[in-house]
A protein has these predicted regions:
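Conserved, single-site charged/polar hotspot
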Residues: 1-195
Length: 195
């Protein structure tokens, strides 16, 4: 489902894989890395097909406009500009080479979730989704700490934070906030905002 429009869209596998790889990785990255991402995206899509609880029939959500999940052809055109033809040809060839490959666990497509970076160590699946998957266990990811945008600062006033909490999470505005800074050192499991 396209999060920005609320519409359920259906894409041919090849188009989905090209858009999914483009959403997750720079097209300039090594061939084998891009092919591995295509296999992970294919496996994840099939896993979501088999485990989706979406009432609208969608396997999962994406937001092409924000370049998340899968990029549509129109978004790829605007994102790549004059490099569209060359980039699309490159990704197409790499996707074509692995389009039939899927990762399985116990005779079913594996839930090969992926993300841009972690805090130096990945998290166990049960801490993220509440379900233990034996192949999604914590591993070292310390090279993430050298990535661009690994660390950044965002300053919000109490009023701005209250507005965002109300708009995005439906948390009532006007709750009292204590002064002080929140510093994220590792994955936060909870954060007390008020009281």
């Amino acid at each position: 489902m396209d999060q920005s429009t609320g519409q359920t869209i259906t894409l041919p596998l090849r188009e989905y894989l090209i858009g999914a790889v483009a959403a997750e990785m720079p097209v300039s990255w090594p061939d084998e890395a891009l092919k591995a991402q295509a296999v992970a995206a294919h496996s994840y899509a099939l896993y979501r097909r088999d485990h989706s609880t979406e009432e609208n029939g969608a396997w999962f959500t994406a937001d092409p406009v924000r370049r998340q999940g899968c990029l549509t052809d129109a978004v790829l055109h605007s994102y790549w500009g004059t490099a569209y033809t060359a980039n699309y040809a490159r990704l197409s060839a790499l996707v074509d080479a692995v389009q039939t490959q899927v990762l399985y666990y116990e005779d079913a497509p594996a839930g090969t979730s992926y993300f841009a970076m972690s805090n130096g160590r990945t998290e166990a699946s049960e801490k993220v989704w509440g379900t233990a998957l034996p192949y999604l266990v914590p591993v070292d990811s310390s090279t993430d700490t050298a990535a661009d945008n690994y660390e950044y600062t965002l300053n919000l006033s109490a009023a701005q934070l209250q507005q965002l909490l109300a708009e995005r999470l439906g948390i009532a505005a006007g709750l009292p906030f204590a002064a002080g800074a929140v510093v994220w050192h590792a994955g936060a499991h909870s954060l007390r905002l008020c009281g």
